[in-house]
Swiss-Prot record:
This is Cholesterol oxidase. It comes from the Bacteria. GO terms for molecular function: cholesterol oxidase activity; isomerase activity. The gene is choxAB. Belongs to the GMC oxidoreductase family. GO terms for biological process: cholesterol metabolic process. The active site is at residue 471. Bifunctional enzyme that catalyzes the oxidation and isomerization of cholesterol to cholestenone (cholest-4-en-3-one), an initial step in the cholesterol degradation process. InterPro entries: 4Fe4S_Fe-S-bd, Cholesterol_Oxidase, FAD/NAD-bd_sf, GMC_OxRtase_C. It comes from Acinetobacter baumannii. It catalyses: cholesterol + O2 = cholest-5-en-3-one + H2O2; cholest-5-en-3-one = cholest-4-en-3-one.
């Protein structure tokens, strides 16, 4: 088979940070690229006014909800992710941080590469492409977090977040449109940030540097084809070559239709899984169990991490309060060496997440905390009910996104659950993840009392002892052998050729910070190992020519 028999050189599953970077760099190297994305393409004018419009916010196609925000519930954790052209960048909080250096000495990837020497250049390129800068707009939530830090003696740790936002020039109001400010005029026109707080509900001002404005934009400009609302249902090696050395046959269908699945088959030379940590794990489990890719490492699904995360906050009642102004995450403090707290907000009117929050009760995780929660309802029914009312939640609430570097993980498996025996579903196993972070809860209660607010947590934490996370990592970890991970130090799937994993599932340790920048930098690194197409063709020609000469010598 020759390369001309393929529909594409590379087929990429997913258009998030890993997929968009891969598409951009591969098209630059001359390859033909297809990107399969389950979600829809969104423009600034398409986003809903607020997140009460569930049909345009939640992604649940089986219920005819075609938004971009996905929430998946497991026994051990509730995971938030994004489904859209541009992946999680459409709905993430726009925060891009470099993790501490020690993470490269930990986990499965420690001996897979010389990370500390290699990664700085890739972080720098990722920051350049994503337009990362210090937050320049401090809203009331940021000023309040600074006061809180000072009140408990950690004010010196307060700092602005690093965000991918196009801010207005000093002294100018946001909302003005400019020609591309990042790529010498080669990129799209951009609008400046208005500090509306709507980063996580879709930026309506073209100020958020989502992937469709940088990596994916240039990938399409260079010829990549993005197939939206398309789900990959099968990937199997071509021509009976079990290791994929001849490429793969990929079957796709429509992700948004109940009945008209629009099945289609593609012949491709290489496949890159970039479907998010959960999406890639689930897909590889199904392909392994169905026999399409049976030699995927048995380590698949192991050590899924969450940044040891917790969502807390303080709610301030009153008409004059407005914590919604600013970027989604504008500042942070460290309350101790391991515990990082970020000031987080939603746009005014986007109060739907308030349904997931409740009054913070004292006590340790488990039934005693439920008892204290019910006792609070009896003792303070008026405050309790106000805390449970989502109306004005975004304006009144300073949300704390708490993260730690503590290494805790669960395992994912594809199996039949007792309550749904009709098909296999992705399920969590292992020890409980840390939910109750004592120092973070103590800080929240203390500053709430000091600043006349009320401490808040999530209802899943109180009732089910289950944490929330937007940072699902691992499950297809980078490692030096298939006994310890799923991909090698260059993101190549063990036991296969021409098969890669480039997304959050590749992370081999707990980062302790928002992972998007690290995923981007690792994707840059993975693509740097793939030579330009013309180089491969020259090598193939030389090899064929040499083989012909050798054959001629033998026959002579």
């Amino acid at each position: 088979m020759t390369i001309n028999n393929y529909d594409y050189d590379y087929l990429i599953i997913g258009s998030g940070f890993g997929g968009s970077v891969s598409a951009c760099r591969l098209t630059e190297k001359g390859y033909s690229v297809a990107v399969m994305e389950m979600g829809r393409r969104w423009k600034a004018e398409d986003f809903a006014k607020n997140n009460w419009n569930t049909r345009r916010w939640i992604w649940r196609p089986g219920m005819k909800l075609f938004g971009y925000f996905n929430m998946r519930f497991f026994r051990h954790v509730t995971i938030i992710c994004g489904n859209a052209v541009g992946g999680g960048s459409i709905t993430y909080a726009n925060t891009l941080l470099v993790p501490p250096e020690h993470i490269w000495d930990e986990g499965t990837w420690a001996d897979a590469a010389d990370w500390k020497n290699e990664m700085p250049q890739h972080y720098a390129e990722a920051e350049r492409m994503l337009g990362v800068t210090d937050n320049k707009i401090f809203g009331p939530a940021d000023h309040m977090l600074k006061k809180m830090g000072e009140a408990v003696g950690v004010g010196h740790t307060f700092k602005p977040t690093r965000v991918a936002t196009f801010f207005p020039p000093e002294g100018e109001e946001g909302g003005k449109t400019y020609p591309d400010p990042y790529f010498n005029g080669e990129g799209p026109d951009r609008g400046t940030c208005t500090a509306c707080g709507g980063c996580m509900t879709g930026c309506k001002h073209n100020a958020k540097n989502t992937l469709d404005k940088n990596y994916l934009y240039f990938a399409e400009k260079n010829g990549a084809k993005v197939y939206e609302e398309t789900k990959v249902v099968d990937v199997k090696p071509l021509n009976g070559k079990a290791d994929g050395s001849d490429g793969y046959e990929v079957t796709t269908g429509c992700s948004s239709s109940w009945f008209n699945k629009q099945r289609r088959t593609w012949r491709v030379r290489n496949v890159i899984f970039s479907a998010s940590s959960l999406g890639t794990q689930e897909m590889l489990f199904r392909l392994k169990q169905s026999g399409s890719l049976p030699n995927i490492s048995d380590d698949l699904g192991n050590r899924v991490r969450t940044n040891a995360e917790s969502i807390l906050g303080v709610r301030f009642f009153g008409k004059d309060v407005d914590m919604s102004k600013g970027v989604a995450i504008g500042s942070s403090i460290y309350i101790d060496h391991d515990t990082h707290i970020e000031a987080t907000r939603y746009q005014s009117g986007s109060d739907a997440m308030g349904l997931m929050c409740t009054y913070m009760a004292k006590g340790k995780p488990g039934w005693t905390r439920i008892f204290f929660w019910l006792w609070a309802l009896i003792c303070h029914p008026f405050i309790f009910l106000r805390m449970s009312n989502p109306v004005s939640f975004a304006r009144q609430t300073l949300i704390f996104l708490v993260m730690q570097t503590a290494d805790a993980s669960i395992n994912m498996r594809l199996k039949r659950n007792w309550f749904w025996p009709f098909g296999k579903v992705l399920s969590s196993e292992g020890k409980k993840l840390p939910v109750y972070i004592p120092q973070a809860n103590a800080f929240t209660e203390k500053v709430a009392k000091m600043f006349n607010g009320h401490p808040m947590t999530t209802i899943t934490e109180i009732l089910f002892n289950v944490p929330f996370t937007a940072h699902c990592m691992g499950g297809c970890a980078i490692a030096s052998s298939p006994e310890r991970g799923v991909v090698d130090g260059q993101n190549r799937v063990f036991n296969y050729k021409n098969l890669y994993v480039v997304d959050g599932s590749m992370l081999g340790a707990n980062l302790g910070v928002n992972p998007s920048l690290t995923i981007t930098a690792l994707a840059e690194r993975a693509m740097s190992y793939i030579p330009a197409k013309h180089t491969l063709e020259e090598q193939a020609y030389t090899q064929t020519h040499n083989e012909v000469l050798e054959a001629a010598k033998v026959s002579a």
